[in-house]
Swiss-Prot record:
Belongs to the ATPase B chain family. It is found in: Plastid, Chloroplast thylakoid membrane. It holds the Pfam family ATP-synt_B. One of its GO terms (molecular function) is proton-transporting ATP synthase activity, rotational mechanism. The keyword Transferase does not apply. F-type ATPases have 2 components, F(1) - the catalytic core - and F(0) - the membrane proton channel. F(1) has five subunits: alpha(3), beta(3), gamma(1), delta(1), epsilon(1). F(0) has four main subunits: a(1), b(1), b'(1) and c(10-14). The alpha and beta chains form an alternating ring which encloses part of the gamma chain. F(1) is attached to F(0) by a central stalk formed by the gamma and epsilon chains, while a peripheral stalk is formed by the delta, b and b' chains. Its main location: plastid. GO terms for cellular component: chloroplast thylakoid membrane; proton-transporting ATP synthase complex. The keyword Cell membrane does not apply. The chain crosses the membrane at residues 27-49. It comes from the Eukaryota. This is ATP synthase subunit b, chloroplastic. Coiled coil: none annotated.
Length: 184
Protein backbone atom coordinates (compact mmCIF):
# COMPACT_ATOMS: atom_id res chain seq x y z
CA UNK A 1 0.00 0.00 0.00
CA UNK A 2 2.77 2.19 0.66
CA UNK A 3 3.61 2.16 -2.97
CA UNK A 4 0.16 3.33 -3.85
CA UNK A 5 0.26 6.29 -1.49
CA UNK A 6 3.71 7.13 -2.60
CA UNK A 7 2.58 7.13 -6.16
CA UNK A 8 -0.24 9.62 -5.37
CA UNK A 9 2.07 11.82 -3.42
CA UNK A 10 4.62 11.70 -6.14
CA UNK A 11 1.95 12.66 -8.67
CA UNK A 12 1.56 16.01 -7.00
CA UNK A 13 5.27 16.75 -7.34
CA UNK A 14 5.94 15.80 -10.89
CA UNK A 15 7.54 18.29 -13.07
CA UNK A 16 5.06 20.10 -15.31
CA UNK A 17 7.03 19.81 -18.49
CA UNK A 18 5.74 16.95 -20.53
CA UNK A 19 4.10 15.08 -17.72
CA UNK A 20 0.60 14.38 -16.54
CA UNK A 21 -0.58 15.27 -13.08
CA UNK A 22 -2.94 17.25 -10.93
CA UNK A 23 -2.41 20.94 -10.61
CA UNK A 24 -3.36 22.00 -7.16
CA UNK A 25 -2.98 25.71 -7.99
CA UNK A 26 -6.59 26.87 -8.39
CA UNK A 27 -5.74 30.05 -10.29
CA UNK A 28 -3.52 28.25 -12.72
CA UNK A 29 -6.12 25.69 -13.73
CA UNK A 30 -8.04 26.41 -16.87
CA UNK A 31 -11.54 25.06 -16.03
CA UNK A 32 -11.77 27.17 -12.91
CA UNK A 33 -10.59 30.28 -14.75
CA UNK A 34 -13.05 29.64 -17.48
CA UNK A 35 -15.92 29.12 -15.06
CA UNK A 36 -15.04 32.34 -13.22
CA UNK A 37 -14.80 34.32 -16.44
CA UNK A 38 -18.07 32.82 -17.62
CA UNK A 39 -19.72 33.53 -14.28
CA UNK A 40 -18.57 37.17 -14.34
CA UNK A 41 -19.68 37.50 -17.94
CA UNK A 42 -23.05 35.97 -17.19
CA UNK A 43 -23.56 38.07 -14.04
CA UNK A 44 -22.54 41.42 -15.53
CA UNK A 45 -23.23 40.68 -19.20
CA UNK A 46 -26.69 39.33 -18.51
CA UNK A 47 -28.17 42.84 -18.22
CA UNK A 48 -26.27 44.18 -21.22
CA UNK A 49 -27.12 41.14 -23.29
CA UNK A 50 -30.79 41.26 -22.27
CA UNK A 51 -30.86 45.01 -23.08
CA UNK A 52 -29.28 44.33 -26.47
CA UNK A 53 -31.72 41.50 -27.12
CA UNK A 54 -34.67 43.63 -25.94
CA UNK A 55 -33.55 46.51 -28.18
CA UNK A 56 -33.15 44.12 -31.08
CA UNK A 57 -36.55 42.58 -30.31
CA UNK A 58 -38.15 46.06 -30.17
CA UNK A 59 -36.52 47.05 -33.46
CA UNK A 60 -37.71 43.83 -35.08
CA UNK A 61 -41.24 44.32 -33.70
CA UNK A 62 -41.20 47.97 -34.81
CA UNK A 63 -40.02 46.93 -38.25
CA UNK A 64 -42.76 44.30 -38.41
CA UNK A 65 -45.38 46.87 -37.30
CA UNK A 66 -44.11 49.36 -39.88
CA UNK A 67 -44.12 46.64 -42.51
CA UNK A 68 -47.69 45.70 -41.56
CA UNK A 69 -48.75 49.37 -41.73
CA UNK A 70 -47.03 49.76 -45.10
CA UNK A 71 -48.63 46.54 -46.26
CA UNK A 72 -52.04 47.79 -45.12
CA UNK A 73 -51.45 51.12 -46.88
CA UNK A 74 -50.31 49.32 -50.00
CA UNK A 75 -53.39 47.07 -49.91
CA UNK A 76 -55.60 50.15 -49.45
CA UNK A 77 -53.88 51.93 -52.33
CA UNK A 78 -54.20 48.77 -54.42
CA UNK A 79 -57.94 48.62 -53.71
CA UNK A 80 -58.30 52.31 -54.58
CA UNK A 81 -56.33 51.75 -57.79
CA UNK A 82 -58.50 48.74 -58.64
CA UNK A 83 -61.65 50.80 -57.99
CA UNK A 84 -60.30 53.60 -60.20
CA UNK A 85 -59.39 51.04 -62.86
CA UNK A 86 -62.91 49.59 -62.77
CA UNK A 87 -64.37 53.10 -62.97
CA UNK A 88 -62.09 54.00 -65.89
CA UNK A 89 -62.94 50.72 -67.64
CA UNK A 90 -66.66 51.44 -67.21
CA UNK A 91 -66.18 54.97 -68.53
CA UNK A 92 -64.11 53.63 -71.42
CA UNK A 93 -66.87 51.14 -72.25
CA UNK A 94 -69.44 53.95 -72.10
CA UNK A 95 -67.28 56.13 -74.32
CA UNK A 96 -66.77 53.22 -76.68
CA UNK A 97 -70.52 52.51 -76.84
CA UNK A 98 -71.35 56.21 -77.09
CA UNK A 99 -68.58 56.66 -79.62
CA UNK A 100 -69.92 53.83 -81.76
CA UNK A 101 -73.45 55.18 -81.56
CA UNK A 102 -72.12 58.68 -82.30
CA UNK A 103 -70.20 57.30 -85.27
CA UNK A 104 -73.31 55.49 -86.50
CA UNK A 105 -75.38 58.66 -86.05
CA UNK A 106 -72.77 60.73 -87.93
CA UNK A 107 -72.62 58.07 -90.62
CA UNK A 108 -76.39 58.12 -91.10
CA UNK A 109 -76.36 61.95 -91.05
CA UNK A 110 -73.67 61.97 -93.74
CA UNK A 111 -75.56 59.43 -95.82
CA UNK A 112 -78.78 61.43 -95.47
CA UNK A 113 -76.96 64.64 -96.37
CA UNK A 114 -75.43 62.92 -99.40
CA UNK A 115 -78.87 61.70 -100.52
CA UNK A 116 -80.29 65.19 -100.03
CA UNK A 117 -77.44 66.66 -102.07
CA UNK A 118 -78.00 64.07 -104.78
CA UNK A 119 -81.71 64.87 -104.77
CA UNK A 120 -81.00 68.59 -105.03
CA UNK A 121 -78.53 67.99 -107.84
CA UNK A 122 -81.06 65.77 -109.59
CA UNK A 123 -83.73 68.49 -109.22
CA UNK A 124 -81.30 71.12 -110.45
CA UNK A 125 -80.40 68.90 -113.40
CA UNK A 126 -84.07 68.35 -114.22
CA UNK A 127 -84.78 72.07 -113.91
CA UNK A 128 -81.79 72.85 -116.12
CA UNK A 129 -82.95 70.32 -118.70
CA UNK A 130 -86.50 71.73 -118.56
CA UNK A 131 -85.16 75.29 -118.86
CA UNK A 132 -82.97 74.31 -121.80
CA UNK A 133 -85.93 72.56 -123.44
CA UNK A 134 -88.08 75.67 -122.95
CA UNK A 135 -85.32 77.88 -124.31
CA UNK A 136 -84.85 75.59 -127.31
CA UNK A 137 -88.60 75.56 -127.94
CA UNK A 138 -88.72 79.36 -127.66
CA UNK A 139 -85.83 79.65 -130.08
CA UNK A 140 -87.59 77.29 -132.49
CA UNK A 141 -90.81 79.30 -132.13
CA UNK A 142 -88.96 82.56 -132.73
CA UNK A 143 -87.24 81.07 -135.72
CA UNK A 144 -90.53 79.71 -137.10
CA UNK A 145 -92.23 83.05 -136.40
CA UNK A 146 -89.40 84.97 -138.08
CA UNK A 147 -89.50 82.66 -141.07
CA UNK A 148 -93.30 82.91 -141.25
CA UNK A 149 -93.10 86.69 -140.92
CA UNK A 150 -90.39 86.83 -143.53
CA UNK A 151 -92.48 84.64 -145.81
CA UNK A 152 -95.57 86.81 -145.19
CA UNK A 153 -93.61 89.98 -145.87
CA UNK A 154 -92.23 88.53 -149.05
CA UNK A 155 -95.72 87.43 -150.07
CA UNK A 156 -97.17 90.82 -149.22
CA UNK A 157 -94.38 92.63 -151.00
CA UNK A 158 -94.96 90.53 -154.06
CA UNK A 159 -98.70 91.33 -154.01
CA UNK A 160 -98.38 94.92 -153.01
CA UNK A 161 -97.67 97.54 -155.47
CA UNK A 162 -97.20 101.20 -154.74
CA UNK A 163 -100.85 102.10 -155.17
CA UNK A 164 -102.06 99.41 -152.73
CA UNK A 165 -99.34 100.40 -150.42
CA UNK A 166 -100.45 104.05 -150.38
CA UNK A 167 -104.10 103.06 -149.79
CA UNK A 168 -103.14 100.84 -146.85
CA UNK A 169 -101.08 103.62 -145.30
CA UNK A 170 -103.92 106.11 -145.73
CA UNK A 171 -106.41 103.70 -144.18
CA UNK A 172 -104.13 103.10 -141.22
CA UNK A 173 -103.58 106.83 -140.72
CA UNK A 174 -107.33 107.35 -140.78
CA UNK A 175 -107.89 104.67 -138.19
CA UNK A 176 -105.22 106.21 -135.98
CA UNK A 177 -106.87 109.61 -136.28
CA UNK A 178 -110.27 108.17 -135.33
CA UNK A 179 -108.76 106.43 -132.37
CA UNK A 180 -107.14 109.65 -131.29
CA UNK A 181 -110.46 111.50 -131.43
CA UNK A 182 -112.16 108.78 -129.39
CA UNK A 183 -109.53 108.85 -126.67
CA UNK A 184 -109.64 112.66 -126.41
Amino acid sequence: MKNVTDSFVSLGHWPSAGSFGFNTDIFATNPINLSVVLGVLIFFGKGVLSDLLDNRKQRILSTIRNSEELRGGAIEQLEKARARLRKVEIEADEFRVNGYSEIEREKSNLINAAYENLERLENYKNESIHFEQQRAMNQVRQRVFQQALQGALETLNSYLNSELHLRTISANIGMLGTMKNITD
